[in-house]
């Protein structure tokens, strides 16, 4: 769990902002949301495969060359 030391004469909202930033960088929120509900291993593999397919389609679309007709 990330922690911060509140500096002397530091306002609470600035300390809270620093704490949130550290939590975001550590990935605490995403990890908690991911582990909120149980996910079957088959669902995990299915989701990962779908993400891989989406990535490849996105990369192929980015590299696709469109021919321009010259008439």
Swiss-Prot record:
Top-rank lineage group of the source organism: Bacteria
Keyword Ribosomal protein: yes
Ribonucleoprotein as UniProt keyword: yes
InterPro entries for the chain: Ribosomal_bS21, Ribosomal_bS21_sf
Molecular-function GO term, any one: structural constituent of ribosome
GO cellular component terms, semicolon-separated: ribonucleoprotein complex; ribosome
Keywords: Ribonucleoprotein, Ribosomal protein
GO BP annotations listed: translation
HAMAP family: Ribosomal_bS21 (MF_00358)
NCBIfam families: S21p (TIGR00030)
Family: Belongs to the bacterial ribosomal protein bS21 family.
Protein name from the UniProt record: Small ribosomal subunit protein bS21
Organism of derivation: Vesicomyosocius okutanii subsp. Calyptogena okutanii (strain HA)
Organism placement in taxonomy: Bacteria, Pseudomonadati, Pseudomonadota, Gammaproteobacteria, Candidatus Pseudothioglobaceae
């Amino acid at each position: 769990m990330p922690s911060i030391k509140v500096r002397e004469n530091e306002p609470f909202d600035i300390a809270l902002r620093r704490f949130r930033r550290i939590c975001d960088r550590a990935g605490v929120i995403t990890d908690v949301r991911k582990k909120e509900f149980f996910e079957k291993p088959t669902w995990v593999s299915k989701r990962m495969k779908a993400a891989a397919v989406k990535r490849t389609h996105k990369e192929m679309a980015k590299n696709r060359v469109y021919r321009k007709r010259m008439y």
